[in-house]
Curated annotation (Swiss-Prot):
Induction: By heat shock. ATP binds at residues 30-33, 51, 87-91, 415, 495. Signal peptide: none annotated. Forms a cylinder of 14 subunits composed of two heptameric rings stacked back-to-back. Interacts with the co-chaperonin GroES. One of its GO terms (biological process) is protein refolding. This is Chaperonin GroEL 1. It is found in: Cytoplasm. The keyword Isomerase applies. GO terms for cellular component: cytoplasm. Keywords: ATP-binding, Chaperone, Cytoplasm, Isomerase, Nucleotide-binding, Stress response. SUPFAM superfamilies: GroEL apical domain-like, GroEL equatorial domain-like, GroEL-intermediate domain like. It is an enzyme of class 5 (isomerase). It comes from Rhizobium meliloti (strain 1021).
Amino acid sequence: MAAKEVKFGRSAREKMLRGVDILADAVKVTLGPKGRNVVIDKSFGAPRITKDGVSVAKEIELEDKFENMGAQMVREVASKTNDIAGDGTTTATVLAQAIVREGAKAVAAGMNPMDLKRGIDLAVAEVVKDLLAKAKKINTSDEVAQVGTISANGEKQIGLDIAEAMQKVGNEGVITVEEAKTAETELEVVEGMQFDRGYLSPYFVTNPEKMVADLEDAFILLHEKKLSNLQAMLPVLEAVVQTGKPLLIIAEDVEGEALATLVVNKLRGGLKIAAVKAPGFGDRRKAMLEDIAILTGGTVISEDLGIKLESVTLDMLGRAKKVSITKENTTIVDGAGQKSDIEGRVAQIKAQIEETTSDYDREKLQERLAKLAGGVAVIRVGGATEVEVKEKKDRIDDALNATRAAVQEGIVPGGGVALLRSSVKITVKGENDDQDAGVNIVRRALQSPARQIVENAGDEASIVVGKILEKNTDDFGYNAQTGEYGDMIAMGIIDPVKVVRTALQDAASVASLLITTEAMIAELPKKDAPAMPGGMGGMGGMDMM
């Protein structure tokens, strides 16, 4: 085991704080409508330009092990917020930095870190309650477009595209973002279905950079039982290989010899194949397999129907123009099913929704209906160069996640104003002075996103924040894009509550851990042994006797 270096107390916290600052300072320049770009050097290909906080955070790795620990903890804040809300990563990073900074000062002044943490938790709980109470529900397509525009750094067209996509496939529909072959960004709605099962083995992946398995013009084998014996599958596999088309297997499970053989064939390049588990459980699994069969024009291979795997022919397999499989989801696009069959199935599910008395069953049936009838909206991102397309795609991903979050929990005034207002409304008291100090840390930290947005726009943060707080109306704030004050919601500057809430909760959670850290352990850097000295040269002028 390698020797470790241990740092305690103040020296540990100082190192950690330096790491937090390096990462947060790189991320926070991207905040707001006038946020700046960050250029990231790639080991291959052109550098990447982005305004996406989590993309910047993920690239940062520091040489000093202790500083790196601090940076990685804050990177965790950005990733967690991104996973849950899909946006707000920069806000979360700014909040985490502010709480850690203030907290470290308080600990250095001799306060109890655990009491500070309790105070922080009390304040955060009150702010979250206040945010949820202030939330305004989203009803119109225009409001959806406004949320999308803000998250895309003020690009109106992106907001409009997302609003249109949501209108076409419904709020629960599936919307994917792809790179276009042209310079224009366009929206396309494709009939399709997505379910929450990913590939059974990472060896099925065709795009290692994104960890996605893409199958074009694929056959689909639907089997309701487990597949473990390869022998029964051989006839259908051989028939598919003859066609040169890829095959997707959807079964209860694929294991043992069957899975191993499929993987080996995929790696050798003889067979383009992927396998996923069937979605759902029990009777619902049968129904969902039947849905997929109707969508793709295939047949579910089921012993109940007297169909054996050995006797399966190509015409029993479903067909789809494209299948995309990630670690968690499978999307089937443009199935070869008959329109009349799909409409019949939709009508049948609608009738079941009418009849059912269970809320849970109704919800699951509506999910199936959305998958069959809603389809998949694809936003194809265009641009003059590859770098521009990637940067735009990042922003559209953020905007899409933000709009979904807004539809779920509602919206509040944007531009950091909601948190600014909540900072004044914190009334909770701790059990002692140290807990009160924790509450005050949150009170001050809540101003940091608004201040950062104003600073990035080149204005004086203290003056702007003072002016906003002078007015006692919730929606009054500062538009950093135009430099005007006014009603934020009327100006279309709004944030989804889910994004703001998640950013604060994740930031406070990680910042509290950093404040309560008293020791840090890291491996000592390896010292390379010095090279062997060169041999002595021959000594001239000395003849042998």
